[in-house]
Amino acid sequence: MASSLRAAISKIKRDDVGQQVCPNYVMLRSSVNTKVVRNVVDYQIKTGGFFSCIAMLRPLQYAKRERLLGQRNLERIAARDVLQTRDLHSLCMPTPDAPMTNYQASTMRELVCDHFKVDHVDGLRYVPMDDRYSPSSLARLFTMGMAGLHITTEPAYKRVPIMHLAADLDCMTFALPYMITVDGDTVVPVAPTLPAERLLDDGFKGYGCLDISYGCEVDANNRSAGDQSMDSSRCINELYTAETAEAICILKTCLILNCMQFKLEMDDLAHNGFELDKVQMMIPFSERVFRMASAFATIDVQCFRFCLLMKDKNLKIDMRETMRLWTRAGSDDAISTSSLTISLDRGRWVAMDMNEVRLLVFPARV
């Protein structure tokens, strides 16, 4: 991001009121204001709200990118490339480039206190009330969520594939780690046996044994989710150790928080037409929201039903219909699909439309 901004400095212009702006530089569909004081460039990024960070799933640049994502040969990873605790911190912790509003920070803090059953002081520890949280922090987490984090105690799988941050959304693999049962043509989602929030209570130990499998792929030309991910990610060895345990906990906590924030925003939008119109101008909605909703292991049954409804309609619906589906997904006990056929085999569950694969589900084991 810093290099992107430096590259954009040469394009700085002044608007009608004399303020320096960067009109040709688009990040988060936001405005970038800069000022130069004693040859030091100061910048402020104004965004349109939480949903604007979805746009940052497109190419990002930040300091750790070369270290984390530069090498593709998975068989020749040097010891210096092993993911360090500080690297996980850099991916998960807040950055000062585009501060969250107090409303966003306080909302997330309330979610922490409520869902993790902690008091106000502990909530502040997870979501401090200052300017350190930013949309770019959230977007990096979303990007990792899209990749399908894979953490397990099996020695052969002690790694975390992370998608290349420059990958386009259409090339990403994302996680949909939910179990389903099928009764005729009715799909009934089943939540994981252990809520992910519970894993926060066992002194980080739960994160070492949490297996979030590769998730869902859409129209992937018959290539497995694992193959897709490995093509554009690196394999990071020996992730869960005494040194990295705390960082893994922070990573998982941030993913959980962002999932909760996403759910909260979806519920707010479902009942707020004015905000809905503003978001509609920001992003192509249906498929992006589907990919967002299917990106996290901690999303509940409502989000899973929502994903199935979206796929059943082939994502060709407008935003208001999307929000109606979201509301419906929260009230229905099961989802009846008009054309999907569900098959369970070889460790993955496939939803077929006629002979075309529409949805692959790789269940999570917690």
Curated annotation (Swiss-Prot):
Pfam families: PolyG_pol
Coiled coil regions, renumbered to chain: none
Protein localization: Host cytoplasm
Family: Belongs to the orthoreovirus sigma-NS protein family.
Name used for this protein in its record: Protein sigma-NS
InterPro entries: Reovirus_polyG_pol (IPR002507)
Note: There is a strain variablity in the inhibition of the host integrated stress response (ISR). There is a correlation with the abilities of the strains to prevent upstream PKR activation and c phosphorylation.
Species: Reovirus type 2 (strain D5/Jones) (T2J)
Stretches the record annotates as Important for ssRNA-binding and formation of complexes: 1-11
Subunit structure: Homooligomer; in presence of RNA. Interacts with protein mu-NS; this interaction allows the localization of sigma-NS to the viral factories. Interacts with host G3BP1 (via C-terminus); this interaction induces the relocalization of G3BP1 and other SG proteins to the viral factories periphery.
Domain of life: Viruses
Function: Protein that binds to ssRNA and participates with protein mu-NS in forming the matrix of viral factories, which are large inclusions in the host cytoplasm where replication intermediates are assembled and viral RNA replication takes place. Plays a role in the inhibition of the integrated stress response (ISR) to escape from host cell translational shutoff. Participates in the disruption of stress granules (SG) through its association with host G3BP1 and mu-NS.
GO cellular component: host cell cytoplasm
GO molecular function: RNA-directed RNA polymerase activity; single-stranded RNA binding
Keywords, alphabetical: Host cytoplasm, RNA-binding
